[in-house]
Amino acid sequence: MKAAYIMACMVLLLVGAASSERGKGWCGEIPPLPGDEKFQRIYVEDATLFHENGREVALWGVNFQTAMSWEWGRSRRDKFKPKFDVDHWKSIVERSFTEIQQMGCDVIRIHLCPGDFADVDGNLIETDWLDMLDYTMSECHRRGIYVYLALLNHLGGEKGRDAILNSTLKEHKWAAMVVPQKLEATDNYIRQLVNRKNPYDQGRVYKSYPGWIIAEVMNEPMWPNEAPSKAEFPESVSVYEEWLAANEKQIGSHAWRTFKTEKIKDYINRIDRLLYEEQVPAVTCWNLFWSQGPVHQGWESFDAAAASTVPMISFSTYPGQSDSQKGTSQDLSEQNYLPYLKQSYEDPEYQGWLQEDRFKGKKASIVYEYETWHNQSTYMYPAMAKYFRAQGAQVATMWTYYLNEEGHELPRSHAHHLNLISTPRKAASFLVAREIFKNTPRYIPYATTEDDADQFGHAALSYPLDLSTYADKNHLVYTGDLKSDFVQLPRIPKQISGYGSSPFIQYKGKGMYFLEAVFEEGQFSNHWNVKVMPHAVFDEEGQVVVNREKEFSMTLRIPGMARSEWQVYRVNSGKRSRVQIQPPAITFHVAPGNYEIIKR
Protein backbone atom coordinates (compact mmCIF):
# COMPACT_ATOMS: atom_id res chain seq x y z
CA MET A 1 0.00 0.00 0.00
CA LYS A 2 2.84 2.37 0.94
CA ALA A 3 4.69 1.54 -2.31
CA ALA A 4 1.56 2.29 -4.34
CA TYR A 5 1.19 5.64 -2.58
CA ILE A 6 4.83 6.56 -3.28
CA MET A 7 4.41 5.56 -6.95
CA ALA A 8 1.28 7.71 -7.26
CA CYS A 9 3.12 10.70 -5.77
CA MET A 10 6.01 10.20 -8.19
CA VAL A 11 3.60 10.16 -11.15
CA LEU A 12 2.02 13.42 -10.00
CA LEU A 13 5.43 15.03 -9.57
CA LEU A 14 6.54 13.90 -13.03
CA VAL A 15 3.36 15.19 -14.65
CA GLY A 16 3.78 18.53 -12.89
CA ALA A 17 7.43 18.79 -13.91
CA ALA A 18 6.65 17.83 -17.49
CA SER A 19 3.83 20.36 -17.60
CA SER A 20 6.19 23.11 -16.45
CA GLU A 21 8.64 22.13 -19.22
CA ARG A 22 5.93 22.02 -21.85
CA GLY A 23 6.37 25.68 -22.65
CA LYS A 24 10.04 25.10 -23.45
CA GLY A 25 9.63 22.97 -26.50
CA TRP A 26 7.44 20.02 -25.47
CA CYS A 27 5.40 18.46 -28.23
CA GLY A 28 3.75 15.10 -28.63
CA GLU A 29 4.62 12.48 -31.19
CA ILE A 30 2.78 12.99 -34.49
CA PRO A 31 2.74 10.12 -37.01
CA PRO A 32 3.67 11.76 -40.34
CA LEU A 33 1.17 11.67 -43.20
CA PRO A 34 1.16 13.23 -46.71
CA GLY A 35 0.56 16.96 -46.49
CA ASP A 36 2.35 17.37 -43.16
CA GLU A 37 5.32 18.93 -44.95
CA LYS A 38 3.28 22.14 -45.35
CA PHE A 39 3.48 22.78 -41.61
CA GLN A 40 6.03 23.61 -38.94
CA ARG A 41 4.86 22.73 -35.44
CA ILE A 42 5.32 25.49 -32.88
CA TYR A 43 6.57 25.61 -29.32
CA VAL A 44 7.20 28.25 -26.66
CA GLU A 45 10.59 29.11 -25.23
CA ASP A 46 11.39 32.23 -23.20
CA ALA A 47 7.86 33.56 -23.80
CA THR A 48 8.37 33.38 -27.57
CA LEU A 49 6.69 31.16 -30.14
CA PHE A 50 9.07 29.33 -32.46
CA HIS A 51 8.64 27.01 -35.42
CA GLU A 52 10.46 23.68 -35.35
CA ASN A 53 13.17 25.16 -37.57
CA GLY A 54 13.93 27.81 -34.95
CA ARG A 55 12.29 30.77 -36.70
CA GLU A 56 10.03 33.08 -34.71
CA VAL A 57 6.34 32.66 -35.45
CA ALA A 58 4.42 35.51 -37.13
CA LEU A 59 1.02 34.33 -38.39
CA TRP A 60 -1.77 36.55 -39.72
CA GLY A 61 -5.32 35.37 -40.24
CA VAL A 62 -9.02 35.50 -39.48
CA ASN A 63 -11.68 33.95 -37.33
CA PHE A 64 -13.42 31.56 -39.70
CA GLN A 65 -16.61 30.20 -38.15
CA THR A 66 -17.49 27.29 -40.38
CA ALA A 67 -18.57 24.93 -37.60
CA MET A 68 -20.84 27.19 -35.57
CA SER A 69 -24.60 27.52 -36.05
CA TRP A 70 -24.39 31.17 -34.97
CA GLU A 71 -22.36 32.11 -38.05
CA TRP A 72 -24.83 30.49 -40.42
CA GLY A 73 -27.63 32.38 -38.68
CA ARG A 74 -25.69 35.64 -39.01
CA SER A 75 -25.37 35.11 -42.75
CA ARG A 76 -29.13 34.64 -43.09
CA ARG A 77 -30.77 37.90 -42.09
CA ASP A 78 -34.07 37.01 -43.73
CA LYS A 79 -37.11 36.72 -41.49
CA PHE A 80 -37.71 33.18 -42.71
CA LYS A 81 -34.41 31.32 -42.81
CA PRO A 82 -34.12 28.31 -45.11
CA LYS A 83 -33.37 24.95 -43.57
CA PHE A 84 -29.66 24.41 -43.08
CA ASP A 85 -28.12 22.55 -46.02
CA VAL A 86 -24.68 21.23 -45.08
CA ASP A 87 -23.60 20.65 -48.68
CA HIS A 88 -24.55 24.18 -49.69
CA TRP A 89 -22.72 25.54 -46.63
CA LYS A 90 -19.62 23.55 -47.59
CA SER A 91 -19.64 25.14 -51.04
CA ILE A 92 -19.69 28.60 -49.43
CA VAL A 93 -16.92 27.60 -47.04
CA GLU A 94 -14.78 26.18 -49.84
CA ARG A 95 -15.06 29.40 -51.83
CA SER A 96 -14.31 31.43 -48.70
CA PHE A 97 -11.18 29.34 -48.07
CA THR A 98 -9.95 30.33 -51.52
CA GLU A 99 -10.70 33.99 -50.76
CA ILE A 100 -8.79 34.09 -47.48
CA GLN A 101 -5.82 32.38 -49.10
CA GLN A 102 -5.87 35.10 -51.76
CA MET A 103 -5.70 37.53 -48.81
CA GLY A 104 -2.61 35.80 -47.44
CA CYS A 105 -4.14 34.14 -44.37
CA ASP A 106 -1.78 31.75 -42.59
CA VAL A 107 -4.12 30.73 -39.77
CA ILE A 108 -7.80 30.54 -38.89
CA ARG A 109 -9.40 30.62 -35.46
CA ILE A 110 -12.47 28.45 -34.92
CA HIS A 111 -14.89 28.72 -31.99
CA LEU A 112 -16.13 25.36 -30.78
CA CYS A 113 -19.56 25.44 -29.14
CA PRO A 114 -20.55 22.34 -27.14
CA GLY A 115 -24.16 23.38 -27.67
CA ASP A 116 -23.71 22.57 -31.37
CA PHE A 117 -22.33 19.04 -31.05
CA ALA A 118 -22.11 17.76 -27.45
CA ASP A 119 -24.52 16.79 -24.68
CA VAL A 120 -24.62 17.93 -21.06
CA ASP A 121 -22.07 15.25 -20.10
CA GLY A 122 -19.62 16.33 -22.78
CA ASN A 123 -20.25 13.42 -25.12
CA LEU A 124 -19.85 14.35 -28.78
CA ILE A 125 -23.00 14.10 -30.89
CA GLU A 126 -22.86 13.51 -34.64
CA THR A 127 -24.40 16.73 -35.97
CA ASP A 128 -23.92 18.80 -39.12
CA TRP A 129 -21.71 21.16 -37.11
CA LEU A 130 -19.38 18.40 -35.99
CA ASP A 131 -19.26 17.25 -39.61
CA MET A 132 -18.33 20.82 -40.60
CA LEU A 133 -15.51 20.80 -38.05
CA ASP A 134 -14.18 17.55 -39.52
CA TYR A 135 -14.40 19.05 -43.01
CA THR A 136 -12.68 22.28 -41.94
CA MET A 137 -9.79 20.47 -40.23
CA SER A 138 -9.29 18.39 -43.38
CA GLU A 139 -9.43 21.43 -45.69
CA CYS A 140 -6.91 23.32 -43.56
CA HIS A 141 -4.53 20.38 -43.76
CA ARG A 142 -4.99 20.13 -47.53
CA ARG A 143 -4.47 23.86 -48.06
CA GLY A 144 -1.62 24.36 -45.59
CA ILE A 145 -3.55 26.64 -43.21
CA TYR A 146 -2.78 26.57 -39.48
CA VAL A 147 -5.63 26.01 -37.01
CA TYR A 148 -6.28 27.85 -33.73
CA LEU A 149 -9.14 26.26 -31.76
CA ALA A 150 -11.07 28.02 -29.01
CA LEU A 151 -12.28 24.87 -27.28
CA LEU A 152 -15.28 26.31 -25.44
CA ASN A 153 -17.77 29.04 -26.27
CA HIS A 154 -21.43 29.70 -25.54
CA LEU A 155 -22.54 30.80 -29.02
CA GLY A 156 -24.62 28.35 -30.99
CA GLY A 157 -26.64 25.46 -29.69
CA GLU A 158 -29.65 23.51 -30.83
CA LYS A 159 -32.85 24.79 -29.27
CA GLY A 160 -33.81 22.79 -26.21
CA ARG A 161 -30.48 20.94 -25.91
CA ASP A 162 -28.73 21.20 -22.57
CA ALA A 163 -24.95 21.47 -22.77
CA ILE A 164 -21.85 22.57 -20.86
CA LEU A 165 -22.35 25.94 -22.58
CA ASN A 166 -24.89 27.09 -25.15
CA SER A 167 -26.43 30.26 -26.54
CA THR A 168 -28.53 30.86 -23.42
CA LEU A 169 -25.65 30.34 -20.98
CA LYS A 170 -23.28 33.23 -21.72
CA GLU A 171 -23.26 34.36 -18.10
CA HIS A 172 -22.75 30.78 -16.94
CA LYS A 173 -19.17 30.48 -18.17
CA TRP A 174 -17.89 30.85 -14.63
CA ALA A 175 -20.16 27.98 -13.56
CA ALA A 176 -18.39 25.72 -16.06
CA MET A 177 -15.16 26.48 -14.17
CA VAL A 178 -16.33 25.55 -10.67
CA VAL A 179 -19.27 23.09 -10.70
CA PRO A 180 -17.86 19.54 -10.37
CA GLN A 181 -20.29 17.98 -12.86
CA LYS A 182 -19.45 20.63 -15.48
CA LEU A 183 -15.73 20.19 -14.88
CA GLU A 184 -16.03 16.45 -15.44
CA ALA A 185 -18.19 17.02 -18.53
CA THR A 186 -15.59 19.45 -19.90
CA ASP A 187 -12.82 16.92 -19.35
CA ASN A 188 -14.87 14.31 -21.18
CA TYR A 189 -15.68 16.71 -24.03
CA ILE A 190 -12.05 17.72 -24.59
CA ARG A 191 -10.75 14.15 -24.38
CA GLN A 192 -13.29 12.96 -26.94
CA LEU A 193 -12.57 15.94 -29.18
CA VAL A 194 -8.78 15.64 -29.28
CA ASN A 195 -9.06 11.88 -29.92
CA ARG A 196 -11.76 12.18 -32.57
CA LYS A 197 -11.02 10.37 -35.83
CA ASN A 198 -11.67 12.56 -38.86
CA PRO A 199 -13.58 10.67 -41.58
CA TYR A 200 -12.42 13.24 -44.18
CA ASP A 201 -8.77 12.36 -43.52
CA GLN A 202 -8.82 8.55 -43.33
CA GLY A 203 -9.53 8.57 -39.61
CA ARG A 204 -6.70 10.89 -38.60
CA VAL A 205 -6.97 11.82 -34.92
CA TYR A 206 -7.41 15.54 -34.24
CA LYS A 207 -4.45 15.84 -31.89
CA SER A 208 -2.16 14.40 -34.57
CA TYR A 209 -2.74 17.30 -36.99
CA PRO A 210 0.55 19.25 -37.21
CA GLY A 211 -1.41 22.32 -38.33
CA TRP A 212 -3.39 22.53 -35.06
CA ILE A 213 -1.04 24.82 -33.18
CA ILE A 214 -3.13 26.68 -30.56
CA ALA A 215 -5.58 25.33 -27.98
CA GLU A 216 -7.33 28.26 -26.32
CA VAL A 217 -9.29 26.96 -23.35
CA MET A 218 -12.35 29.22 -23.50
CA ASN A 219 -13.43 32.28 -25.44
CA GLU A 220 -13.85 35.30 -23.14
CA PRO A 221 -14.22 33.43 -19.81
CA MET A 222 -16.46 35.91 -18.03
CA TRP A 223 -17.10 35.99 -14.28
CA PRO A 224 -19.37 38.23 -12.17
CA ASN A 225 -17.46 40.98 -10.36
CA GLU A 226 -19.53 40.35 -7.25
CA ALA A 227 -20.96 37.11 -5.87
CA PRO A 228 -24.31 36.47 -7.59
CA SER A 229 -27.45 35.22 -5.89
CA LYS A 230 -27.88 31.56 -5.11
CA ALA A 231 -31.32 31.69 -6.73
CA GLU A 232 -29.69 32.51 -10.07
CA PHE A 233 -26.69 30.17 -9.79
CA PRO A 234 -27.56 27.50 -7.18
CA GLU A 235 -24.80 24.98 -8.01
CA SER A 236 -22.05 27.56 -8.51
CA VAL A 237 -22.83 29.58 -5.40
CA SER A 238 -22.95 26.35 -3.38
CA VAL A 239 -19.32 25.76 -4.43
CA TYR A 240 -18.51 29.29 -3.25
CA GLU A 241 -20.22 28.70 0.10
CA GLU A 242 -18.29 25.46 0.59
CA TRP A 243 -15.06 27.33 -0.20
CA LEU A 244 -15.92 30.04 2.34
CA ALA A 245 -16.52 27.43 5.03
CA ALA A 246 -13.35 25.48 4.22
CA ASN A 247 -11.25 28.65 4.32
CA GLU A 248 -13.04 30.20 7.31
CA LYS A 249 -13.87 33.34 5.37
CA GLN A 250 -16.83 35.69 5.53
CA ILE A 251 -18.94 36.68 2.53
CA GLY A 252 -17.61 39.89 0.98
CA SER A 253 -15.85 41.43 -2.00
CA HIS A 254 -12.37 40.43 -0.84
CA ALA A 255 -13.41 36.81 -0.33
CA TRP A 256 -15.11 36.69 -3.73
CA ARG A 257 -12.05 38.08 -5.49
CA THR A 258 -9.81 35.54 -3.75
CA PHE A 259 -12.18 32.71 -4.66
CA LYS A 260 -12.38 33.94 -8.25
CA THR A 261 -8.59 34.12 -8.69
CA GLU A 262 -8.03 30.72 -7.11
CA LYS A 263 -10.72 28.94 -9.11
CA ILE A 264 -9.70 30.48 -12.43
CA LYS A 265 -6.10 29.45 -11.84
CA ASP A 266 -7.18 25.93 -10.85
CA TYR A 267 -9.31 25.68 -13.98
CA ILE A 268 -6.54 26.90 -16.31
CA ASN A 269 -4.07 24.43 -14.82
CA ARG A 270 -6.62 21.62 -14.94
CA ILE A 271 -7.21 21.99 -18.69
CA ASP A 272 -3.52 22.57 -19.39
CA ARG A 273 -2.69 19.35 -17.51
CA LEU A 274 -5.43 17.45 -19.37
CA LEU A 275 -4.06 18.55 -22.75
CA TYR A 276 -0.58 17.53 -21.64
CA GLU A 277 -1.80 14.11 -20.52
CA GLU A 278 -3.45 13.67 -23.91
CA GLN A 279 -0.18 14.70 -25.61
CA VAL A 280 -1.80 17.50 -27.61
CA PRO A 281 1.06 19.40 -29.30
CA ALA A 282 -1.01 22.59 -29.70
CA VAL A 283 0.16 25.32 -27.31
CA THR A 284 -2.33 25.99 -24.51
CA CYS A 285 -3.61 29.55 -24.24
CA TRP A 286 -5.77 31.53 -21.80
CA ASN A 287 -8.05 34.29 -23.08
CA LEU A 288 -7.72 37.71 -21.39
CA PHE A 289 -10.51 39.67 -23.01
CA TRP A 290 -10.69 42.93 -24.89
CA SER A 291 -9.25 46.39 -24.20
CA GLN A 292 -10.32 47.61 -20.75
CA GLY A 293 -10.74 44.00 -19.69
CA PRO A 294 -9.53 44.75 -16.14
CA VAL A 295 -12.22 47.44 -15.84
CA HIS A 296 -15.03 45.21 -17.07
CA GLN A 297 -13.92 41.84 -15.68
CA GLY A 298 -11.60 42.72 -12.79
CA TRP A 299 -7.94 41.82 -12.38
CA GLU A 300 -8.57 38.31 -11.06
CA SER A 301 -8.37 36.49 -14.41
CA PHE A 302 -5.16 38.37 -15.21
CA ASP A 303 -3.65 37.45 -11.84
CA ALA A 304 -4.68 33.82 -12.30
CA ALA A 305 -3.26 33.59 -15.83
CA ALA A 306 0.05 35.13 -14.78
CA ALA A 307 0.42 32.54 -12.01
CA SER A 308 -0.80 29.58 -14.09
CA THR A 309 1.10 26.93 -16.04
CA VAL A 310 -0.10 28.01 -19.50
CA PRO A 311 2.75 29.47 -21.58
CA MET A 312 0.58 31.84 -23.61
CA ILE A 313 -2.23 34.40 -23.27
CA SER A 314 -4.50 36.03 -25.83
CA PHE A 315 -6.14 39.46 -26.07
CA SER A 316 -8.41 41.36 -28.46
CA THR A 317 -8.62 44.96 -29.64
CA TYR A 318 -11.79 46.68 -30.85
CA PRO A 319 -11.35 50.41 -31.56
CA GLY A 320 -14.80 52.01 -31.53
CA GLN A 321 -16.58 49.27 -29.59
CA SER A 322 -17.28 51.43 -26.54
CA ASP A 323 -18.38 54.35 -28.77
CA SER A 324 -20.79 52.13 -30.64
CA GLN A 325 -22.27 50.68 -27.47
CA LYS A 326 -23.12 54.14 -26.12
CA GLY A 327 -26.00 54.26 -28.60
CA THR A 328 -27.41 52.56 -31.63
CA SER A 329 -25.07 51.02 -34.17
CA GLN A 330 -23.55 53.61 -36.45
CA ASP A 331 -20.84 53.99 -39.05
CA LEU A 332 -17.69 55.08 -37.20
CA SER A 333 -15.46 55.34 -40.28
CA GLU A 334 -15.14 59.13 -39.91
CA GLN A 335 -13.50 58.96 -36.47
CA ASN A 336 -9.73 58.87 -35.91
CA TYR A 337 -8.83 55.91 -33.70
CA LEU A 338 -5.03 56.20 -33.78
CA PRO A 339 -5.06 57.93 -30.34
CA TYR A 340 -7.07 54.97 -29.01
CA LEU A 341 -4.20 52.60 -29.82
CA LYS A 342 -1.74 54.90 -28.05
CA GLN A 343 -3.93 54.91 -24.94
CA SER A 344 -4.35 51.13 -25.13
CA TYR A 345 -0.57 50.72 -25.18
CA GLU A 346 0.10 53.08 -22.28
CA ASP A 347 -2.83 52.55 -19.90
CA PRO A 348 -2.68 49.34 -17.79
CA GLU A 349 -6.48 49.26 -17.57
CA TYR A 350 -6.68 49.18 -21.37
CA GLN A 351 -3.88 46.86 -22.56
CA GLY A 352 -0.79 48.35 -20.97
CA TRP A 353 -0.83 45.34 -18.64
CA LEU A 354 0.85 43.41 -21.47
CA GLN A 355 4.03 45.38 -20.71
CA GLU A 356 4.08 44.22 -17.07
CA ASP A 357 6.96 41.94 -16.09
CA ARG A 358 4.60 39.11 -15.15
CA PHE A 359 3.45 38.91 -18.80
CA LYS A 360 6.21 40.41 -20.94
CA GLY A 361 9.03 37.89 -20.94
CA LYS A 362 6.92 35.32 -19.07
CA LYS A 363 4.02 34.50 -21.42
CA ALA A 364 3.84 34.44 -25.19
CA SER A 365 0.99 36.59 -26.50
CA ILE A 366 -1.41 36.39 -29.45
CA VAL A 367 -4.44 38.35 -30.66
CA TYR A 368 -7.57 36.22 -30.61
CA GLU A 369 -9.77 38.87 -32.25
CA TYR A 370 -9.51 42.39 -33.63
CA GLU A 371 -11.73 44.60 -35.73
CA THR A 372 -12.47 48.21 -36.61
CA TRP A 373 -15.92 48.27 -35.06
CA HIS A 374 -18.68 49.56 -37.41
CA ASN A 375 -15.85 50.97 -39.48
CA GLN A 376 -14.86 50.52 -43.13
CA SER A 377 -11.78 52.77 -43.02
CA THR A 378 -8.49 51.40 -44.37
CA TYR A 379 -5.83 52.94 -42.11
CA MET A 380 -6.64 51.09 -38.88
CA TYR A 381 -5.79 47.46 -39.69
CA PRO A 382 -2.20 48.49 -40.55
CA ALA A 383 -1.99 50.65 -37.42
CA MET A 384 -3.27 47.75 -35.33
CA ALA A 385 -0.71 45.37 -36.84
CA LYS A 386 2.07 47.71 -35.70
CA TYR A 387 0.40 47.99 -32.27
CA PHE A 388 0.15 44.20 -31.91
CA ARG A 389 3.87 43.81 -32.58
CA ALA A 390 4.63 46.50 -30.02
CA GLN A 391 2.68 44.37 -27.52
CA GLY A 392 4.69 41.29 -28.49
CA ALA A 393 1.94 39.41 -30.35
CA GLN A 394 2.97 36.68 -32.78
CA VAL A 395 -0.41 35.52 -34.09
CA ALA A 396 -3.42 37.71 -34.91
CA THR A 397 -6.86 36.66 -36.18
CA MET A 398 -9.47 39.22 -37.23
CA TRP A 399 -13.06 38.70 -36.03
CA THR A 400 -14.56 37.53 -38.28
CA TYR A 401 -14.35 36.71 -41.98
CA TYR A 402 -17.86 36.90 -43.38
CA LEU A 403 -18.89 33.68 -45.13
CA ASN A 404 -21.35 35.23 -47.53
CA GLU A 405 -23.01 34.38 -50.78
CA GLU A 406 -24.61 36.56 -53.41
CA GLY A 407 -27.65 38.34 -52.02
CA HIS A 408 -26.60 38.03 -48.38
CA GLU A 409 -23.97 40.78 -48.07
CA LEU A 410 -23.86 42.70 -44.79
CA PRO A 411 -24.45 46.49 -44.60
CA ARG A 412 -21.64 49.06 -44.37
CA SER A 413 -22.30 49.80 -40.70
CA HIS A 414 -22.22 46.18 -39.53
CA ALA A 415 -19.97 45.71 -36.49
CA HIS A 416 -17.85 42.96 -38.05
CA HIS A 417 -17.56 42.97 -41.81
CA LEU A 418 -14.55 41.76 -43.78
CA ASN A 419 -14.84 39.95 -47.08
CA LEU A 420 -12.60 40.00 -50.15
CA ILE A 421 -15.58 40.47 -52.48
CA SER A 422 -17.95 42.75 -50.57
CA THR A 423 -15.41 44.93 -48.67
CA PRO A 424 -12.51 45.22 -51.14
CA ARG A 425 -10.82 48.31 -49.64
CA LYS A 426 -10.88 46.77 -46.19
CA ALA A 427 -9.49 43.55 -47.66
CA ALA A 428 -6.65 45.57 -49.18
CA SER A 429 -5.93 47.11 -45.77
CA PHE A 430 -5.87 43.59 -44.30
CA LEU A 431 -3.13 42.74 -46.80
CA VAL A 432 -1.17 45.90 -45.91
CA ALA A 433 -1.49 44.96 -42.23
CA ARG A 434 -0.26 41.43 -42.94
CA GLU A 435 2.99 42.75 -44.40
CA ILE A 436 3.47 45.10 -41.45
CA PHE A 437 2.80 42.34 -38.92
CA LYS A 438 5.28 39.98 -40.54
CA ASN A 439 8.03 42.57 -41.07
CA THR A 440 7.90 44.64 -37.87
CA PRO A 441 10.09 43.55 -34.92
CA ARG A 442 8.30 42.94 -31.63
CA TYR A 443 8.38 45.20 -28.59
CA ILE A 444 9.31 48.43 -30.36
CA PRO A 445 7.44 51.04 -28.25
CA TYR A 446 4.23 52.09 -29.95
CA ALA A 447 4.17 55.65 -31.33
CA THR A 448 3.01 57.40 -34.51
CA THR A 449 4.72 60.18 -36.46
CA GLU A 450 1.53 62.27 -36.27
CA ASP A 451 -1.75 62.05 -34.36
CA ASP A 452 -3.62 61.22 -37.55
CA ALA A 453 -0.95 59.56 -39.71
CA ASP A 454 2.11 57.36 -39.49
CA GLN A 455 5.11 56.41 -41.59
CA PHE A 456 7.50 53.62 -40.57
CA GLY A 457 9.64 51.01 -42.26
CA HIS A 458 8.12 50.23 -45.63
CA ALA A 459 4.63 51.39 -44.61
CA ALA A 460 2.55 54.55 -44.47
CA LEU A 461 -1.01 55.24 -43.34
CA SER A 462 -3.24 58.29 -43.11
CA TYR A 463 -6.57 58.92 -41.40
CA PRO A 464 -7.35 62.13 -43.39
CA LEU A 465 -6.68 60.35 -46.70
CA ASP A 466 -8.16 57.03 -45.50
CA LEU A 467 -5.20 55.35 -47.13
CA SER A 468 -2.53 52.82 -46.24
CA THR A 469 0.24 51.13 -48.16
CA TYR A 470 3.18 48.77 -47.85
CA ALA A 471 6.01 48.89 -50.40
CA ASP A 472 9.27 46.96 -50.40
CA LYS A 473 11.51 46.03 -53.34
CA ASN A 474 9.25 43.15 -54.38
CA HIS A 475 5.76 43.85 -53.12
CA LEU A 476 3.34 46.78 -53.28
CA VAL A 477 -0.04 46.88 -51.53
CA TYR A 478 -2.39 49.87 -51.31
CA THR A 479 -5.98 50.64 -50.31
CA GLY A 480 -6.82 53.56 -52.60
CA ASP A 481 -5.43 55.96 -55.17
CA LEU A 482 -1.70 56.08 -54.44
CA LYS A 483 0.71 58.83 -55.46
CA SER A 484 4.47 58.44 -55.66
CA ASP A 485 5.13 60.84 -52.76
CA PHE A 486 3.10 58.86 -50.18
CA VAL A 487 5.70 56.12 -49.74
CA GLN A 488 8.98 55.13 -51.38
CA LEU A 489 8.01 52.88 -54.28
CA PRO A 490 9.99 50.00 -55.80
CA ARG A 491 11.23 50.51 -59.35
CA ILE A 492 9.40 47.42 -60.63
CA PRO A 493 7.37 45.49 -58.04
CA LYS A 494 7.06 41.76 -58.59
CA GLN A 495 3.65 41.68 -56.90
CA ILE A 496 0.93 44.31 -56.71
CA SER A 497 -2.20 43.91 -54.60
CA GLY A 498 -4.35 46.99 -54.83
CA TYR A 499 -7.56 48.95 -54.89
CA GLY A 500 -7.81 52.08 -57.05
CA SER A 501 -4.87 53.42 -59.02
CA SER A 502 -1.13 53.81 -58.52
CA PRO A 503 1.84 54.92 -60.64
CA PHE A 504 1.94 51.34 -62.00
CA ILE A 505 -1.75 50.59 -62.58
CA GLN A 506 -4.76 52.74 -63.36
CA TYR A 507 -8.07 51.04 -62.68
CA LYS A 508 -11.56 52.53 -62.49
CA GLY A 509 -13.35 49.56 -60.96
CA LYS A 510 -14.23 49.24 -57.26
CA GLY A 511 -12.76 45.85 -56.54
CA MET A 512 -9.33 44.50 -55.64
CA TYR A 513 -6.85 43.23 -58.21
CA PHE A 514 -3.67 41.17 -57.97
CA LEU A 515 -0.74 41.38 -60.40
CA GLU A 516 2.15 38.92 -60.09
CA ALA A 517 5.29 38.36 -62.15
CA VAL A 518 5.90 34.71 -63.06
CA PHE A 519 9.40 33.36 -62.48
CA GLU A 520 10.87 30.10 -63.76
CA GLU A 521 14.08 28.81 -62.18
CA GLY A 522 14.62 32.20 -60.60
CA GLN A 523 14.32 34.13 -63.88
CA PHE A 524 11.47 36.39 -64.97
CA SER A 525 9.58 34.52 -67.69
CA ASN A 526 8.12 37.61 -69.42
CA HIS A 527 4.76 36.59 -68.05
CA TRP A 528 2.40 38.32 -65.61
CA ASN A 529 -0.73 36.88 -63.98
CA VAL A 530 -3.61 39.23 -63.18
CA LYS A 531 -6.65 38.47 -61.04
CA VAL A 532 -9.53 40.98 -60.94
CA MET A 533 -12.17 40.79 -58.22
CA PRO A 534 -15.84 41.87 -58.60
CA HIS A 535 -16.90 45.51 -58.47
CA ALA A 536 -18.48 46.33 -55.06
CA VAL A 537 -19.93 49.60 -53.74
CA PHE A 538 -22.20 50.72 -50.90
CA ASP A 539 -25.54 52.17 -51.98
CA GLU A 540 -27.26 55.17 -50.36
CA GLU A 541 -28.68 52.95 -47.63
CA GLY A 542 -25.26 51.51 -46.83
CA GLN A 543 -25.93 48.11 -48.37
CA VAL A 544 -23.22 46.38 -50.39
CA VAL A 545 -23.99 46.02 -54.09
CA VAL A 546 -21.72 43.54 -55.90
CA ASN A 547 -21.42 43.36 -59.69
CA ARG A 548 -19.66 40.21 -60.85
CA GLU A 549 -19.78 40.95 -64.59
CA LYS A 550 -19.13 44.67 -65.18
CA GLU A 551 -16.03 45.60 -67.22
CA PHE A 552 -13.64 48.46 -66.48
CA SER A 553 -10.54 49.86 -68.12
CA MET A 554 -7.13 48.85 -66.73
CA THR A 555 -3.83 50.45 -67.77
CA LEU A 556 -0.40 49.07 -66.91
CA ARG A 557 2.52 51.50 -66.67
CA ILE A 558 5.31 49.20 -65.57
CA PRO A 559 8.78 50.43 -66.61
CA GLY A 560 10.17 48.60 -69.63
CA MET A 561 6.82 47.22 -70.83
CA ALA A 562 6.16 48.61 -74.31
CA ARG A 563 2.62 48.13 -75.60
CA SER A 564 3.76 46.63 -78.93
CA GLU A 565 5.69 43.84 -77.20
CA TRP A 566 2.94 42.37 -75.00
CA GLN A 567 -0.34 40.54 -75.42
CA VAL A 568 -3.20 40.15 -72.91
CA TYR A 569 -5.31 37.00 -72.58
CA ARG A 570 -8.37 36.24 -70.51
CA VAL A 571 -8.19 32.77 -68.94
CA ASN A 572 -11.41 30.88 -68.32
CA SER A 573 -11.54 27.17 -67.43
CA GLY A 574 -7.97 26.77 -68.65
CA LYS A 575 -8.67 28.32 -72.05
CA ARG A 576 -7.14 31.58 -73.28
CA SER A 577 -8.94 34.23 -75.30
CA ARG A 578 -7.11 37.24 -76.67
CA VAL A 579 -7.97 40.70 -75.30
CA GLN A 580 -7.56 43.82 -77.40
CA ILE A 581 -4.91 46.31 -76.20
CA GLN A 582 -5.42 50.03 -76.70
CA PRO A 583 -3.22 53.10 -76.11
CA PRO A 584 -2.02 54.68 -73.89
CA ALA A 585 0.56 52.24 -72.51
CA ILE A 586 -1.02 48.79 -72.09
CA THR A 587 -4.73 49.52 -71.75
CA PHE A 588 -7.44 46.86 -71.92
CA HIS A 589 -10.90 46.15 -70.52
CA VAL A 590 -11.28 43.62 -67.71
CA ALA A 591 -14.20 41.89 -66.08
CA PRO A 592 -13.81 39.92 -62.84
CA GLY A 593 -11.62 36.91 -63.55
CA ASN A 594 -8.10 35.81 -64.47
CA TYR A 595 -5.78 37.23 -67.11
CA GLU A 596 -2.27 36.61 -68.42
CA ILE A 597 0.03 39.23 -69.92
CA ILE A 598 2.71 37.58 -72.06
CA LYS A 599 5.54 39.06 -74.08
CA ARG A 600 5.13 38.41 -77.80
Language-model regions: role of each:
Residues 476-600:
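C-terminal beta-sandwich/jelly-roll accessory domains of carbohydrate-active enzymes
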Residues 194, 427-476:
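A conserved mid-domain beta-alpha-beta active-site/ligand-binding segment of alpha/beta enzyme cores
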Residues 254-265, 269, 273, 279-287, ...:
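Glycoside hydrolase catalytic-domain groove-lining segments
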Residues 60, 373-450:
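Substrate-binding cleft of secreted/luminal carbohydrate-active enzymes
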